[in-house]
Amino acid sequence: GFSAESQNSTVTSFSSDKAINFPYHEIRDATSNFSLSQKIGQGSYGTVYLGKLRGTDVAVKQMKDTKSREFLSELNMLCNVHHTNLIELIGHAVGGDSLFLVYEFAQNGALSDHLHKSSVRGKFHALKIDKNAGFAPFPWTTRIQIALGVAKGLEYIYLHIKPYYVHRDVKTSNILLDSNFRAKVDCRFGLVKLLEQHSKEIGTAASRIVGTIGYLAPEYVRDGYVTTKSDVYGFGVVLLELLSGQPALSRDASPENSQYVEHRSLVDYILSALDNDDYLTKLTQCIDSALSHYHEDSLFQ
């Protein structure tokens, strides 16, 4: 656990003009003493709880490893990231032998759920002005706005944060949506990696491949070098998901043998359509059937 000395040294090792140092009791009370009913996530870097802090819904992450130089370096960076299309670190607290990071909470959850989860898909309010209008899947204009928001968030990471960082895990489950369905890229600790070179195009050798199958750029898997182009590939897969409504990787049981599960890459699926003589017809068949109104020219672009 933390000693009082290590707690203080950890907190004072990073600074921010905006991050708030919350008293521990506020974090504890906000999460109902870290109740299991408030738990909304679990990852290699810690546990995430939903909390109500000073009248605002927040996501509270209880961190595991907080003593490494890499942790403090990335924490310093996150404290000073402020962009409307990135999940923002609001503040931190120390107590109960843990460090807690407080993030803004995205009320509408992950984009992946809205595209692929049957219990969530179709819960987009078609006409929010008319409360009786009912719900409908994401319209074309909303999907375009989400894609644009993600692009702006990633651009901010690449152009406005020094030294260079990349995300490493751009995917629909790391794209969160606020109450207005504005895209918020989740770049919480553990997702970004410092590029050791001075050029973001050169990249840095990864000690291990980090990311998600279906979103990994082939050259990253082959050579093990992380660059912004690795993220751009993942962003391209996100665009294909927005267009097709299909996940990046599908699991299909073989009709001959139900025990055999074949993984189909969305990228391969779309590329096979493009490789067809009648590719426009094939591509049209790849489009999400829930998209009833869209401009073909802009979609195929």
Model-found features: residue ranges?
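Conserved N-lobe motifs of Hanks-type protein kinase catalytic domains
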Residues: 43, 81-84
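Glycine-rich ATP phosphate-binding loop
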Residues: 47-65
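Protein kinase catalytic-loop region centered on the HRD/HxD motif
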Residues: 152-165
